[in-house]
């Protein structure tokens, strides 16, 4: 590494309201699936690190649950705490918003970053979904007026448009430092944690509107047998009726959830996976702080 090309490295919080594409952006920058995604808000429930390594530097991305104003249930409060706690010790923040939309929760996310006293890059995601391309510039002017951003980047995380320029600008905000992680490392989370998240992703994708929010996944068994991973996953719900829905007629839905989860695990872990799944009931777990702690929520 020459003196003309210093290496930059630091922590970058990825903040925004639910469902703006924070996890899709994290995965795109890392170049691997470290954070689950779905079309439903609040898919991300845990703080995790995504490690994006480039010749010029390393971004340690702190992917967070979406910040939301309503905190009626314990789960919502826990996720908001995780999002706010992610700002401790970070060097910069990415405020991710959806092109054409700015509301109270976007303002909340901006205020949280501003109060942290770190440089903030505005990332305007989903520009490919704008029906009128001419509406982008007036929207950017509206959002940036009276708000201090270190840089503004319209992007499409899903299509990977605009990411190179974003990375260049974010690296400039980070200190000159050697990498914190090795080149092959992509996250601070264990395979056991990621396995549970991949099962939960399928629950978010395959179940109805409300039911995914009443489910969580606990990995009871994770063992290596040569090139075979043996994984046992418990899907927790809050009522017997929900259990029947997750299992489906003749066990069809649970079988589909398991099959798709297994394929995702094999792709991510680079190994064959033998996956068993069970569905169990723990009443009211999502509004019970003790239960949330037992299931690994921070």
From Swiss-Prot:
Top-rank lineage group of the source organism: Bacteria
Region (G2): 42-46
One Gene Ontology cellular component annotation held by this UniProt entry: cytosol
GO terms (BP aspect): ribosomal small subunit assembly
Protein name per Swiss-Prot or TrEMBL: GTPase Era
Quaternary structure (record): Monomer.
Residue ranges of every copy of the KH type-2 domain listed in the record: 199-283
HAMAP family for the chain: GTPase_Era
Similarity annotation: Belongs to the TRAFAC class TrmE-Era-EngA-EngB-Septin-like GTPase superfamily. Era GTPase family.
Positions that bind GTP: 16-23, 63-67, 125-128
Coiled coil: none
Membrane topology summary: Peripheral membrane protein
Region (G3): 63-66
Gene Ontology molecular function: GTP binding; GTPase activity; ribosomal small subunit binding; small ribosomal subunit rRNA binding
Domain Era-type G: 8-176
Function: An essential GTPase that binds both GDP and GTP, with rapid nucleotide exchange. Plays a role in 16S rRNA processing and 30S ribosomal subunit biogenesis and possibly also in cell cycle regulation and energy metabolism.
Protein localization: Cytoplasm; Cell inner membrane
Keyword field: Cell inner membrane, Cell membrane, Cytoplasm, GTP-binding, Membrane, Nucleotide-binding, Ribosome biogenesis, RNA-binding, rRNA-binding
Region G5, annotated ranges: 155-157
Signal peptide: none
Region (G4): 125-128
Stretch list, region G1: 16-23
């Amino acid at each position: 590494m020459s003196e003309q090309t210093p290496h930059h490295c630091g922590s970058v919080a990825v903040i925004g309201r639910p469902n703006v594409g924070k996890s899709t952006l994290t995965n795109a920058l890392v170049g691997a699936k470290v954070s689950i995604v779905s079309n439903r808000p609040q898919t991300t429930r845990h703080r995790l690190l995504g490690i994006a390594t480039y010749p010029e530097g390393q971004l340690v991305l702190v992917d967070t649950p979406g910040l939301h104003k309503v905190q009626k249930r314990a789960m919502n409060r826990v996720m908001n705490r995780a999002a706010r706690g992610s700002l401790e010790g970070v060097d910069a923040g990415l405020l991710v918003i959806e092109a054409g939309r700015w509301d109270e929760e976007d303002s909340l996310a901006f205020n949280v970053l501003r109060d942290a006293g770190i440089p903030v890059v505005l990332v305007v995601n989903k520009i490919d979904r704008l029906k009128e391309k001419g509406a982008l510039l007036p929207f950017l002017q509206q959002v940036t007026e009276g708000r201090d951003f270190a840089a503004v980047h319209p992007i499409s995380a899903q299509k990977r448009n605009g990411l190179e320029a974003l990375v260049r600008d974010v690296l400039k905000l980070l200190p000159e430092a050697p990498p914190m992680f090795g080149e092959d490392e992509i996250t601070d989370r264990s395979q056991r944690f990621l396995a549970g998240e991949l099962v939960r992703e399928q629950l978010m994708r395959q179940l109805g509107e409300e039911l995914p929010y009443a489910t969580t996944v606990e990995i009871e068994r994770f063992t290596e047998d040569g090139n075979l991973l043996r994984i046992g996953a418990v899907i927790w719900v809050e009522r017997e009726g929900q259990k029947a829905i997750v299992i489906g007629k003749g066990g069809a839905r649970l079988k589909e959830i398991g099959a798709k989860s297994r394929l995702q695990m094999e792709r991510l872990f680079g190994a064959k996976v033998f996956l068993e799944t069970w569905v169990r009931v723990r009443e009211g777990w999502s509004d019970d702080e003790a239960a949330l702690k037992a299931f690994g929520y921070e």
